[in-house]
């Protein structure tokens, strides 16, 4: 059995924890540089505020009550996520952090001493008393069914935020799946759900009753695995250690439009520096560095321009100096004067766990001497609270 604990309206709830005066008031959290809405409290949702709504539009809208907006504070959200994780680990021996606000728990054998839903209520109270955050808990014999149960616990308040789908109550599971739209199933996106709908499959129960071989032939092995999971066959195990990332992206929308190359170069260098820090945090090396720039697609009076360029390195690196240099070379290939740029970013790909590659004695490019040691010292200073060391390109 698995349980999925999901923090309700996570970003907005984190802001409310430290502002008791905002209880029952509509709160939204804005993206980097206050570009658009990325999180809403339940009260804000009831006002009809949509995800992705630009801040300048929201600011001019009229509501029956004031809407409180916060700039995103990712350090706070990471800290609160870690606190939730710690409290869950106090009651469950094996926990997987699926996302910043979702955690899977292995709860096999729990029912020998406590009812599953009673345990879910215990989890809710333990997290609420320790962090001030409210979680919803869904339980099932597979991860997909636990996710479906968690969806239902949010959809119908009468469950009190806790719902268990057990192997001994097949009728309850089938009833829930008959009410769950296929697009709400974990791992089924909008594109796949549209194709399923054309085949007459509109609910989770209909998908569960589909032939797995037919699904694999017409879609892929991932959707076939989902079908098996909906039927109680566990195909996705708990990952206590998160898998290594395949890509790192650092980007930001500008508060004011960027019109000069120097300002853009500084922004790209800053993104490249942060991406390199994340790369070392993953204990990875990369060979592929890409930079993208674009103007606002909403600026009707200005021509739209967006472009991306990439650099492939001969030697995998995690050295900030190499990554910044490659990012600047990529920027030089996409920069065009005369535009008012709204966003830029840096992406790292093609990861390897070590920086070792086959070299030629006559290669012009050789690995930097003592590069890893220098980066370790740099990261140690920046994370120690003693100060901040950065590169001159910023």
Q: What is each residue range found by the language model?
A:
Residues 1-228, 238, 365-394:
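Gly/Gly-Pro- and Ser/Thr-rich, intrinsically disordered tail segments characteristic of DNA damage-repair
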Residues 135, 139, 287-293, 342-345:
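A short glycine-rich, hydrophobically flanked beta-strand micro-motif that places a catalytic Asp/Glu
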